[in-house]
Amino acid sequence: MHNSSMTSTLSQDDAEIQSPRPHSDVVEVYSAGLVIPITAPSVLDGAIAVSGGRIEHVGSRDWVIHALEQAGCPFVEHHVDGVLMPGLVNAHTHLQYTGMAQVGARRYTGFPSWAQAFDAVYDHTEFDWSAEAARGARLSIRYGTTSAADVVTDPEAASALHDLGLHGVAYWEVMGWSNEDWAARGPASVNASLDAMPTPPQIGISPHAPYSLDAEPLLDLPDLARRRNLRLHIHLGESHSEAEWKEGRTAQLDDLWRSGASTSFTEMRSLGGGFSATQFVDQLGVLGPDCHVAHGVYMTADDRRRLRSRNTAVALCPRSNRVIGLDAPPVAAYLNEGNLLAVGTDSLSSSPSLDVMEDVALLYKIARAQGYGEGDLARRLLHTATLGGAVALGLSTGRQRVGQLQSGAVADMVFFDVPVTTIVDTIEELVQTGASRQIATIIDGSLRWVDPRFSDFFEGDVQ
């Protein structure tokens, strides 16, 4: 058994990822000063027993070891004095844009100025999308992410999660289709792209946004996904243009549908429709428990109600919103009203890093600034970064469940170098300062990344 406590200061480029190793007959016991299962009470001096890539036992260290000894199971223990919790779920990212960090390193005045900077790099730079997506996947593992919602725009980037052994969903992004082009060849094109994507993990469809697709593809894509038993993921409420008009509304959504002037969200807006993008996609049947949305910044109380009614989760990406120059998402309202929440980093083209805990810390500050004063904030935000993300990706139940530490679940975990005091105070410290303090990432029970200064703590003798 080993222990230590030192702060990691590794840079993004130090992500040396280990290959998955074959499962052995020896049970691995991972113990820590505090274990946070998410689906059960946190345990001081806790432990997780792992066998065959799955969790066997969760509880106090003494109980877990006693249970293994009583069963005559050989085991090896790895102990760190910090925190052990489920692997993080990055519920919205674009790993292929890892090479566009120069765009995300700046600040912008709104969506148009950011899009101009993005297009200037995307259109005039030769990228190896496969290599960049793989690098993004490695960085994700370094930051404790074990599952991701990866939006794929170029087919070369489609295999990043598959190749690196990450869980989650790779979503094929669909954008720029007019009604006419879609009718001629859209469904066949999308189906062919989906058929070419490797599995596992799961694949899904990402209709980019209400403003980047005409109405017919937005109407058809949910049906196409559901016939194939695929999940959906859409950017929604990210730009000012998607917000409901507070004044000057001249036409209601139902009126415009009946008039036949419903070729696209943009066209209907130009004809005086003051409805929100959320109302628009809800009318088209996009939302549902098999769909989650990214950003959700410009959402009225009615928009948030619609998301709750459809059991649709929101992946909040506050650092991306800040870089682009958008408002902060209504975090306090989401929490008070009971919306399903997850956390995403977005891509390095609009965010400083792929560390989900950076976004968690910012969400904490935003919620407090917006008046959320309850003492459960830190605990709830840890939930959004783990089980909340699993719910958003459809991975919270069943044999492949993630985002939780419980018997039978996939053994995806992350260690943090955070000093352990009381349970409440340690969780507060983890949420507010846990970014870049990851020690080790375990996927399917296999050690995939470890801070080199802690590497010997993950070796041990069989007992």
Which stretches of residues belong to each language-model region?
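Histidine/acidic residue-rich metal-binding segments in metalloenzymes
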Residues: C73-F75, E156-L164, G186-A313, G325-L341
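Active-site beta-loop-alpha junctions enriched in small/polar residues
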Residues: H94, T153-D154, E173-W177, H208-P210, ...
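Active-site gating loops and adjacent loop-to-helix segments of metal-dependent hydrolytic enzymes
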Residues: G99-A131, V169-M175, H240-G288, L363-Q370
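His/Asp/Glu-enriched, well-ordered alpha-helical/loop segment
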Residues: Q283-V286, P329-V420
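C-terminal cap of metal-dependent C-N hydrolases
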Residues: S407-Q463
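Alpha-helical scaffold segments that flank or form the walls of functional sites
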Residues: V83-L84, G99-L164, P187-P198
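Histidine-rich, glycine-flanked metal-binding segment
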Residues: H2-V29, V35-M85
